[in-house]
């Protein structure tokens, strides 16, 4: 009788999920507040621990203002986060930015609570 080849199953390698916390902004501003800097410092530590990971910073605004104005403001918000991460030692070539202005609200309502949620930067991991 011929011997059947032994089937060896490869161990499954769990891919580590890397999540970076979003930051929020004041109305019509792109400056980083102390609490947003703390979040960015934590995000920088995560990026340092995963040096092959790249990130896209998405700048978002609330619904007030024109499309053009909010696209520009969203880009300034994304760039302010990028510049701070670079200052913290993250290579600029690992970070790209995009602005969605007011096109992708987290909360579609028209009130201060919703607007505060929508004024944000989100961090999308690219590997």
What are these regions (language model features)?
Residues 58-127:
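Periplasmic OmpA-like peptidoglycan-binding domain that tethers envelope proteins to the cell wall
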Residues 1-54:
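Periplasmic peptidoglycan-binding/tethering modules of Gram-negative envelope proteins
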């Amino acid at each position: 009788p011929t011997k059947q080849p032994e089937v060896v199953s490869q161990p499954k390698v769990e891919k580590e999920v890397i999540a970076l916390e979003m930051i929020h902004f004041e109305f019509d501003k792109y400056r980083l507040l102390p609490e947003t800097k703390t979040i960015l410092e934590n995000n920088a530590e995560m990026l340092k621990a995963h040096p092959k990971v790249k990130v896209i910073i998405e700048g978002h605004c609330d619904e007030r203002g024109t499309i053009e104005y909010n696209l520009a403001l969203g880009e300034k918000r994304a760039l302010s986060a990028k510049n701070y991460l670079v200052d913290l030692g993250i290579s600029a070539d690992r970070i790209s930015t995009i602005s969605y202005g007011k096109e992708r609200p987290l909360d579609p309502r028209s009130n201060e609570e919703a607007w505060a949620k929508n004024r944000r930067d989100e961090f999308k991991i690219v590997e």
